[in-house]
Amino acid sequence: MSRRAWLPRGFAVAAASLALLAILSGCAGGPDKPKPTDLGPNAALLDVRQVWTARVGVVGFPLDLKVNGGVLTLADSEGVIAAVDGATGRDQWRTALGAKIGAGVGSDGRYVAVLSSANDLVVLDAGREIWRETLGALGHTAPLVAGARVFVMTADRVVAAFDAQSGRRLWSYSRTGDQQLALRQAGVLLAVGDTLVAGISGRLVGLNPLNGTLRWEAPIANPRGVNDVERLVDLVGRVSREGDVVCARAFQAAVGCVNAARGAVLWSKPAGGFEGVHGDREFVFGTESDGKVIAWRRADGERAWVSERLKYRGLTAPLVAGRSVVVGDAQGFVHFLSRQDGTPLGRMSTDGSAIVAAPVLVGNTLAVVTRNGGVFGFRPE
């Protein structure tokens, strides 16, 4: 099931879930699928121009764009990884792994890590592969590269750490008794101070990055319902981090914020989306499954505004960029909304295929990637 449908994308892990997946996929592709809202004239209140384009192959996995020091690192489904200069769009290096990619990318500016669709963790140094290690399950979350270590989370909810240079496994952490299904979608894995924070089921979990021991758990959503699909509340990337506070979305259940220094839930509010969130010190922004764009007040989670101008357009997770909230859609448009009230400020077109990853800023360039492999750099005048 495509994320670009207004229903959730498919599930993976338990063989018993395949029948459910078929039912849900059929619903998403039926004749009653809502028509994307007409955009109307371009407001053009924000002066933005396209400054470069680049290209990779088709992207059919949950791509996470990584930015380090003015360089954008990305990959395509066939195993090509590229490091692109954010100012010019030119390759700094490009490598073909010879293996299809299932999740990525992770990078600290030197090491780059991806997960292959054959369950391999593959690590490169300066664009050259240095090792690969077979994992026990598929992964859909980009590895985290930090502190000369590579951290991974697989669909069986195992978190593991490897030495970035040698590939030696350092530790692993797993939970028992969690949900039997897992999303075929990027989850949550990031560093906050000296804590590794992972999204496991509906919780943010704080781990010691040196040995994998549990420090705290903070539930953003609790499983509810009578079957495994209804009880699925995995946390989905991207997240919004300001200092020690991390805000995240639980799939089709809630948006909430956690103090990652103390493991304390600050607030959690019902929300019906399946893409991650982004924000600043004042607001947390998210896109709902029907295309609403919502701003929650970061202090208490109360709604500041709701925009319905992009309903059923298959929106990405948002990006806060200056006075704008930026989202991509399934028709290849990049939309700029006012962060204060959601008013449309303008839009840019790409190649007509869906925007497949949340937009990112590379220096003063906004970068987006389409399903057909188009990489576009936009810059405000």
Language-model-derived ranges and their functions:
Residues 2-16:
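Bacterial N-terminal signal peptides that target proteins for export
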Residues 23-26:
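C-terminal motif of bacterial Sec signal peptides marking the signal peptidase cleavage site
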Residues 76, 116-117, 154-155, 199-201, ...:
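Structural signature of WD-repeat beta-propellers
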Residues 30-66, 93-109, 130-146, 169-193, ...:
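Extracytoplasmic beta-rich repeat domains
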Residues 85-88, 125-128, 163-166, 209-211, ...:
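Short loop/turn segments that connect beta-strands within beta-propeller blades
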Residues 286-295, 302-336:
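Loop/turn-rich, solvent-exposed surfaces of beta-rich toroidal or solenoidal domains
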